[in-house]
Amino acid sequence: MAAYAWLYCALALGATWYLQRYLRQRDAYSVLRNIPGPPSYSWAKGHINQYFNPRGQAFHEEVALNYGSVVKLDGMFGSKLFYVADPKALHTILIKEENTWEEPDAFLALNQLMFGDCLVGTLGEHHRRQRKMLNPVFSVNHMRHMLPIFYNVILKLREVILAKVKAGESEIDVLEWSGRAALELIGQGGLGYSFDPLLVNSESRNEYGDALKSCFPALSKVDILRRYAHYLIKMGPRWFRRSVVDMYPNPDVQNIKEVVDTMSAKSYEIFNQKKVALKRGDEAVLRQVGEGKDIMSILIKANTAASEDERLPESELIAQMSLLVFAATDTTSNTLARILQLLAEHQEIQVKLRDEILQSSAGGNDISYEELNRLRLLDAVCRETLRLFPPVTTLRRVPRKDSVLPLSEPIYGVDGRVINEIPVAKGTDVIIGTYGVNVRKQLWGEDSLEWKPERWLSPLPSAVTAAAIPGVYSNIMTFLGGKRACIGFKFSEMEMKVVLAVMLSTFTFERTEKVIQWNIAGVSYPTVEGNSQPQLPLKMGLYRP
């Protein structure tokens, strides 16, 4: 009888647990179904084609502005997902319960397939150790020491374009040249390696840079790779997965494979060169590009000196190198191209910004780190562009257990009921509403969709400061927040400011007759109407006081 009693007790406990879990999930699902959202016209595809469409900017605006701070979207085959742009809910996701809310398995697996065990492919304690090792080399103090490297690269860029303009070439693809400069900046400043000499007589395009530039558009077309990478990574040993990819008859997949192979080979080559130089001593290090001040040289030294339990294996250091190059090239260069386009469209702001730069002590050349950050309009132009046009529009999180998201302000359900918090069942797909927070009219005002750098020259609206937006940068969500925020945002900010200071003190920028279209992908990129290749041509001339 005692044995039966224990059995009945165990069954009762199991049934109670299952019933509670079922009720929680039912409640969560009923709340989710009650959240407003745009109508869906396909049970099989939901809003996927609209949201992830390269020309889906209008739909992104509709989601961000028309349905409140939390929006219900339809996924594939009747599944539901959240779009969350409520600051308090985002604080819970990114900071308060960061160990519960993690990147989707497919995202982590894709990064592991492309780079290895890098910062955006690891979780928990593994991620903490990597971040602890990397944080010092992205500090303000280290950025200050890297500034001479930045000017060295950008002054070379200026000479190349100056020669072109003097030769009568007025239409310049600013995306190409900002991309080449970004690659060389992360090469010299990040890896202590020169990818591109940026010489006046060098007309050859950089194949490595071109490959990187084509990767995000290619990734956006390979839906199966992005969605099912966590299954692909489990398909047998590495050699088997490699053979499957080699045989896969898709040009975009082959393009991605080529980029990954190139990054991996170059990272191993650079890493081995650095190890040899460090073993030979300071004199050998000083002879390298960057003179040992680059991120990887310092990181390798720090890793060697770290305690055994904090030390990273060489494979992970190499993975960080590939990630650095990949992440730093497109995001910043595309944002720079966007800024130059906006300045070409807003000539009055271009003139004011040039005046501010020329009135600095260095007149646009070799401005100190402190003075560069005191140029208020330059800072405002960068912040406003990053607010209105975040280069990465879609980042996702999935709760590893049931969670509850509190809201800053209540929302109204489809049935009119007030919703103050949202129960979220384990495994629910959530989109971080970066764009939604950045353009929300309740925070930024009725002109939130207008590019107005001057909004940063006065105190921000009280609604913005009171909202406690959990972003790591300037009350916006562009670089995310919490321990998984973009680690290189200071590097990116300094790069944009140095490029703009040097280029605007020398050149003028105007629109061409060509229609520029921006495409949503992993990183947004521009094309010319009728052409799928990433590019952004502008008319450039010599500035004459």
Curated annotation (Swiss-Prot):
Its cofactor is heme. Pathway: Secondary metabolite biosynthesis. Its EC number is 1.-.-.-. The keyword Heme applies. CDD domains: CYP_FUM15-like. Residues 1-14 form the signal peptide. It comes from the Eukaryota. One of its GO terms (molecular function) is heme binding. Pfam families: p450 (PF00067). InterPro entries: Cyt_P450, Cyt_P450_E_grp-I, Cyt_P450_sf, Cytochrome_P450_monoxygenase. Heme binds at residue 486. Keywords: Heme, Iron, Metal-binding, Monooxygenase, Oxidoreductase, Signal. Cytochrome P450 monooxygenase that is able to use anthracene and pyrene as substrates for oxidation. Belongs to the cytochrome P450 family. This is Cytochrome P450 monooxygenase 212. It comes from Postia placenta (strain ATCC 44394 / Madison 698-R). The lineage of its organism: Eukaryota, Fungi, Dikarya, Basidiomycota, Agaricomycotina.
